[in-house]
Amino acid sequence: MKLNELYNNIGAKKNKKRIARGIGSGKGKTGGRGIKGQKSRSGVAIKGFEGGQTPIIKRLPKRGFNCISTKKYNIINIYNIEEALADGRLSADDNITKEKLVEARVVNNKNNKKLVKLLSICSDDFAAPLSLKLDAYSSKAKDLIEKAGGKLL
């Protein structure tokens, strides 16, 4: 047996019905599209049209809204600040502000439009006494910084 001698068993694979190949084929002339009209033309798909029944987009109610006063935060963790201190990108002696975090590449903050919030995920201890001036802090992050002798400005 060779690769070029392989074939499917008879009846294992049925040929697809080829439409619009003459009236003797059983699916000829209009090819199952009916006569004239928008749906008989090529490239048509009426988006959202469900044949006259009320479309789902109209059946379902409007829900929710976009609050314009929602505050969007850049989230950073205490370990991000620890890494920047270890690398020398931040100094423990300075007041750590949003601008210094952007300079140290801890926060990616284009035009300083977003607020910065400090979390304490994966951090149970924090040694350096830092003075931070950020927009928001989680309660656990506040406790860790104050326990280490730091200040929140």
UniProtKB/Swiss-Prot annotation:
Residues 21-41 are annotated as: Disordered. GO terms for cellular component: large ribosomal subunit. It comes from the Bacteria. One of its GO terms (molecular function) is structural constituent of ribosome. GO terms for biological process: translation. Residues 23-35 have a biased composition (Gly residues). The keyword Glycoprotein does not apply. InterPro entries: Ribosomal_uL15, Ribosomal_uL15/eL18, Ribosomal_uL15/eL18_sf, Ribosomal_uL15_bac-type. Keywords: Ribonucleoprotein, Ribosomal protein, RNA-binding, rRNA-binding. Belongs to the universal ribosomal protein uL15 family. Part of the 50S ribosomal subunit. Binds to the 23S rRNA. NCBIfam families: rplO_bact. PANTHER family: 50S RIBOSOMAL PROTEIN L15, LARGE RIBOSOMAL SUBUNIT PROTEIN UL15M. This is Large ribosomal subunit protein uL15. The lineage of its organism: Bacteria, Pseudomonadati, Pseudomonadota, Alphaproteobacteria, Rickettsiales. The gene is rplO.
